[in-house]
């Protein structure tokens, strides 16, 4: 074998080896297309599709800080200093379409902190507390709603006014477990029926009392409403299965102009005591009323007044000012006159209090 043949053979072997290695090389796959989050506008602003599903999700809530001074207009006691409180509310909403209608869920977690002046003699006068609560958690399919929510005795008529101290004269307890169905017609008419577990200690004069049912019989709430461009009128009736008494409210709202609206609400209870789930005002009856004036795009003035059968009168006014979109500052002044039978429950007949609320909503 001559040198030329040896060189040609070696070159052929190298070419063959290179071809074999090329055949065994790993080929990188083509990159997959990135699936960006899609906006879902079927249920309002802020929703997006959960990737890989047709479920729309929204994460929202608010951060709030309150500073209070003067008297406690609920109890009539002097605070003897500033009360401060903070809250972070985290809300999660979902929505999707099914063959039985729109399926929605709503949950709200509240993280609360309070630093209240104790009024005792000492170097430091503040008492602090903090806690977390699952405020709401419900499922809604069409008009059917099940879970933890606020009582239809409040929500169906539209709560009270747009003031912070709106329930100095309480119109019933709030949070409850419930099963409700709301019918909504195309002509402005709607109706609701609800079976409720009874309120917890979110409401009213009695403070820490829970008004849960003590057997299988639920509380029952029913209501009718008619709404139009002029305003609305609504009425609700509630039966308290624990004390076997009933309470009712009727409310009317009128839009005078696009900027100015007024409302009036009257209530009656068959049990003349605030120690109950629904009729938590003093005596047989109570009345609330108020107005709202949207002075500018940023500033709104709110006023509310209330009076009950036992002689308590409560008046509150505020100005809600939106400094920038999503950030609102609300200074508020409240006055309570404890007259009639309420005089025996408080140390002072008159209470003046103020609060400033800072809230960032998102």
UniProtKB/Swiss-Prot annotation:
GO terms for cellular component: cell outer membrane; pore complex. InterPro entries: Porin_alphabac. It is found in: Cell outer membrane. One of its GO terms (molecular function) is porin activity. It is a multi-pass membrane protein. One of its GO terms (biological process) is monoatomic ion transport. Residues 1-22 form the signal peptide. Transmembrane segments: none annotated. Keywords: Cell outer membrane, Ion transport, Membrane, Porin, Signal, Transmembrane, Transmembrane beta strand, Transport. The keyword NADP does not apply. The keyword Membrane applies. The pore formed by Omp2a is larger than the one formed by Omp2b. Omp2b pores have optimal permeability to allow growth and protection against harmful compounds. The larger pore formed by Omp2a may be advantageous for intracellular growth, when the bacterium is competing with the host cell for nutrients whose concentration is particularly low within the phagosome. Consists of 16-stranded beta-barrel sheets, with large surface-exposed loops, that form a transmembrane pore at the center of each barrel. The pore is partially ocluded by a peptide loop that folds into the pore lumen. Homotrimer. Forms passive diffusion pores that allow small molecular weight hydrophilic materials across the outer membrane. Belongs to the alphaproteobacteria porin family. This is Porin Omp2b. It comes from Brucella melitensis biotype 1 (strain ATCC 23456 / CCUG 17765 / NCTC 10094 / 16M).
């Amino acid at each position: 074998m001559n040198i030329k043949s040896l060189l040609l053979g070696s070159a052929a072997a190298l070419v063959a080896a290179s071809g074999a290695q090329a055949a065994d090389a790993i080929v990188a796959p083509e990159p997959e297309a990135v699936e960006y989050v899609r906006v879902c506008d079927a249920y309002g602003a802020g929703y997006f599709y959960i990737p890989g599903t047709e479920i729309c999700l929204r994460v929202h809530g608010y951060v709030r800080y309150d500073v209070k001074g003067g008297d406690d207009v609920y109890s009539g006691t002097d605070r003897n200093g500033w009360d401060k409180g903070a809250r972070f509310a985290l809300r999660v909403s979902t929505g999707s379409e099914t063959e039985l209608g729109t399926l929605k869920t709503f949950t709200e977690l509240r993280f609360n902190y309070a630093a209240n002046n104790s009024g005792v003699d000492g170097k430091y006068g503040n008492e602090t507390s903090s806690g977390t609560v699952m405020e709401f958690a419900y499922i809604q399919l069409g008009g059917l709603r099940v879970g933890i929510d606020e009582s239809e005795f409040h929500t169906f008529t539209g709560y009270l006014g747009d003031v912070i101290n709106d329930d100095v004269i309480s119109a019933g307890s709030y949070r409850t477990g419930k099963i409700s169905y709301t019918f909504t017609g195309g002509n402005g008419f709607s109706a609701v029926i609800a079976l409720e577990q009874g309120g917890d200690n979110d409401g009213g004069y009695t403070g820490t009392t829970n008004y849960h049912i003590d057997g299988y019989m639920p509380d029952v709430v029913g209501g009718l409403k008619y709404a139009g461009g002029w305003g609305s009128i609504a009425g609700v009736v509630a039966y308290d299965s624990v004390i076997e008494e009933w309470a009712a409210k009727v409310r009317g709202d009128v839009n005078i102009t696009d900027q100015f609206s007024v409302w009036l609400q009257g209530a009656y209870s068959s049990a003349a005591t605030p120690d109950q789930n629904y009729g938590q005002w003093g005596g047989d009856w109570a009345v609330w009323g108020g107005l709202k004036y949207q002075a500018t795009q940023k500033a709104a003035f709110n006023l509310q007044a209330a009076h009950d059968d036992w002689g308590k009168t409560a008046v509150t006014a505020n100005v809600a000012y939106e400094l920038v979109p999503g950030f609102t500052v609300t200074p508020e002044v409240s006055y309570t006159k404890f007259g009639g039978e309420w005089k025996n429950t408080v140390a002072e007949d008159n209470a003046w209090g103020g609060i400033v609320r800072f809230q960032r909503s998102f």
